[in-house]
Design a protein with these regions (language model features):
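Helical scaffold of the NTase/Pol beta-like nucleotidyltransferase catalytic core
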Residues: 192-197, 227-252
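Active-site microenvironments that recognize anionic phosphate/pyrophosphate groups
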Residues: 1-222, 226-229, 303-305, 319-323, ...
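Catalytic or ion-translocation cores adjacent to nucleophile or general acid/base/metal-coordination motifs
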Residues: 235, 244-267, 273-334
């Protein structure tokens, strides 16, 4: 049984171009060693193809049976990553192939590396396929929604083990270059099948990789080779455009550098990008204006729920200068009437979420104005999802959400299935503790569908209403509202430029 499963995995590696055919015996022996097995029987007849997750599961079951690992998702993930690494080329070989493809075109290079990152099981395609995805029309264009199911839930034993495990300082975080080839531990994922492409950004060494969770097509991460904190400054714009010049078919953006409006990792300087067109990119300019000294730069307010200034020019240096000017002005800007305060008690509140791209030969930079002030009424943030929407989304509005993609918690899948049953069978959501938080929302939207809702359309209706909530969430994150008053306040800031 073990021999057959190993043979299948080696065949997979050869078919996918991960393992040269001449290394078949060598790779087989590496895998035998991982299992502590001395004996091997080559299958007598050719084996039929099986999906990678099936092959790995049979090997993992064997490892559990032999007492090599515990039967838990955490230990299984650590072990199958070790198995996959036996098939893979070393980092220098991956980098060499990337350079060869890049000589053909940047697109050829990223297509190769993205495919490699999936075939190596660094991106677990069979888990990504579980994510629930849909699109919703809105006043701002077609918004993307995803319920994230690809991050595995840890079982209680693994959680307990992680709590007892010594917190290591190597690698310092999950974005550090030291993750490449790292075997992992119960409280840190294995990255033996991870490969990084070195690139130069702002004359310093950075790394290029893909996100293992792929929230959108070719979702990449670009990170500083040094473990230094996030900071939005002039150099940020230089780095963004250095990358876009290397990979003109990709956008690249940064999370803001303050809590509440920033991402989940502020301790390591990094960006996120990819090969995908978000609703924000398609959104038109609503109000055009010019900034003294930058009359040659196309500038305007974007029709978008967050407060976004878009600047465009053929010369990215003009955009870097102007973006730095806007950032400096925004950092120090206060408008009490609009409830915008640059700082309170010495704590700064204003920052920017920037997104760079190249469109039709012209460089473009979107600057989303952010503010992280809190009040008694809104203790998590005034420009953050308000409490009435927390039943759907209460987490920070980071870069990905700013661009128009909702990443919603996995609990929503089961809650929506239960809610469907309640609505169709005319049961009360109040009878189910997990649905209590949704009751005000259901009471608000359900009456308009009461006569038409049925088994065929209920999924579409719930998805549409979840999408509407997310648009409200984005509007909450906008410093200047999208009505006439808000636009007047926005233009007051523009006049200071």
């Amino acid at each position: 049984m073990l021999s057959e499963s190993i043979a299948r995995l080696v065949d997979y590696g050869i078919r996918r171009g991960l393992t040269p055919a001449c290394e078949k015996i060598y790779t087989t022996n590496l895998l035998l060693e991982v299992f502590g097995e001395d004996d091997y029987q080559e299958p007598e007849t050719p084996l039929s193809e099986k999906p990678l997750d099936e092959i790995l599961n049979s090997l993992l079951d064997e490892a559990v049976k032999r007492g090599i690992i515990e039967d838990s998702i955490v230990y299984r993930d650590l072990f199958d990553t070790k198995l996959m690494n036996c098939l893979l080329p070393r980092p220098a070989q991956v980098q060499q192939t990337f350079r060869e493809r890049y000589a053909l075109s940047p697109t050829a290079a990223t297509e190769y590396f993205y495919q490699f990152s999936q075939d190596s099981d660094y991106i677990r395609r069979y888990r990504i396929a579980r994510d629930v995805r849909w699109k919703v029309d809105s006043d701002y264009g077609e918004i993307d929604i995803t319920i994230n199911l690809s991050k595995p839930e840890k079982d209680p034993k693994a959680i307990a083990a992680a709590r007892l495990a010594k917190s290591g300082s190597y690698p310092k975080c999950q974005l550090c270059a030291e993750n490449e080839g790292y075997a992992g531990r119960v409280n840190h994922p294995a990255r033996e099948n991870h490969r990084i492409i070195p690139i130069t950004v702002n004359n310093s060494p950075w790394g290029f990789q893909y996100s293992p969770y792929v929230y959108y097509n070719e979702h990449c991460i670009v990170f500083n080779q040094e473990h230094v904190p996030m900071k939005i400054e002039r150099a940020t714009f230089v780095k963004l455009f250095d990358f876009v010049k290397l990979f003109p078919h990709y956008f690249l953006g940064s999370n803001a550098d303050l809590p509440i409006v920033g991402g989940s990792i502020l301790s390591h300087d990094h960006f996120q990008g990819g090969h995908y067109t978000f609703a924000m990119e398609k959104a038109p300019i609503e109000i055009r204006f010019t900034i003294p000294g930058y009359e040659d730069v196309e500038t305007g307010i974007v029709k978008w729920p967050l407060s976004v200034i878009r600047i465009r020019h053929r010369d990215e240096k003009r955009l870097i200068d102007l973006a730095d000017h806007i950032l400096t002005a925004w950092r120090g800007y206060t408008d009490e009437e609009a409830f915008v305060f640059a700082e309170t008690d010495g704590t700064p509140h204003n920052t920017i979420t920037p997104i760079a791209r190249k469109r039709d030969g012209i460089f473009e930079l979107d600057l989303a104005l952010r503010n992280n002030i809190t009040t008694e009424e809104h203790p998590l943030g005034v420009y953050h999802p308000h409490a009435q929407w927390h039943h759907i989304k209460k987490e920070n509005i980071g870069l990905i959400e700013v661009m128009g993609l909702a990443v919603l918690p996995s609990r929503l899948k089961n809650e929506m299935e239960l809610l469907k049953t309640c609505i169709l069978e005319k049961k009360s959501p109040a009878d189910y503790p997990e649905l209590e938080k949704h009751i005000p929302w259901v009471e608000e939207f359900l009456p308009q569908y009461q006569t038409i809702i049925n088994e065929d359309n209920i999924t579409d209706i719930l998805q549409k209403e979840i999408g509407r909530v997310f648009v409200h969430v984005l509007e909450d994150a906008g410093v200047f509202s999208c009505d006439a008053e808000g636009r007047k306040a926005f233009l007051r800031f523009v006049e200071t430029l």
